[in-house]
A protein has these predicted regions:
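Conserved short hydrophobic beta-strand within the ABC ATPase nucleotide-binding domain
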Residues: 157-160
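Walker B catalytic acidic pair
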Residues: 116-118
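Conserved NTPase motor "head" modules and their coupling/switch loops across ABC/AAA+ ATPases, GTPases
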Residues: 2-112, 121-125, 129-133, 137, ...
Length: 170
């Protein structure tokens, strides 16, 4: 239960940062909410003992904190079922930005942002809003297969291409 309490407390700290990041990127009046869902309550040891034969049969444990999950909703509707790809991607990006924001708030240090190919699933307005949401003092490394967003970036960005294992300016 200690792990679950820590996770629930962390999510409570992250929730306002997630909502703000989503509003900044989404640009709409969509309300995102995230709740922690523990897989099961009760004594984990007892549950593991009771399911040992089944766990061996399946080759994996059926109980434990690895089965916990997040319930994410947009405007009260299950995001996994009803959100568009852009909305789902915006939610995932918002969660990462929220982690960065909370880490900066707690430590006083801005983390490095490693961003892997997020632009293919975002419309142009969300791309620009995402770039504007990155902290100005953060080092951000962005990989992409789409370069069209680079021309609409809010400020000039150095760009490189990786070719035959070597970096070369674009």
């Amino acid at each position: 239960t200690e792990l679950r309490n820590l996770r629930a407390n962390l999510l409570a700290l992250l929730a306002p940062h997630i909502a703000l990041a989503y509003r900044n990127i989404g640009g709409r009046q969509e309300q995102v909410s995230i709740a922690y869902r523990a897989s099961e309550e009760g004594d984990l040891y007892e549950r593991l003992c009771a399911s040992m034969d089944r766990d061996i049969r399946y080759g994996q444990t059926q109980n434990g904190p690895h089965r916990d999950d997040l319930d994410i909703t947009l405007n009260g509707r299950n995001a996994a079922q009803f959100a568009s790809e852009g909305q789902q991607r915006t939610t995932a990006i918002s969660m990462k930005l929220a982690q960065s924001s909370l880490l900066t708030e707690e430590t006083g240090h801005t983390p490095i942002h490693l961003i892997d190919d997020v632009f293919g699933e975002l419309d142009p307005s969300r791309r620009i809003a995402f770039l504007q949401s990155l902290p100005a003092d953060a080092q951000s490394l962005i990989t992409t297969t789409h370069l069209d967003w680079l021309h609409n970036a809010p400020c000039p960005l150095p760009a490189f291409r990786l070719e035959d294992g070597a970096l070369a300016p674009l």
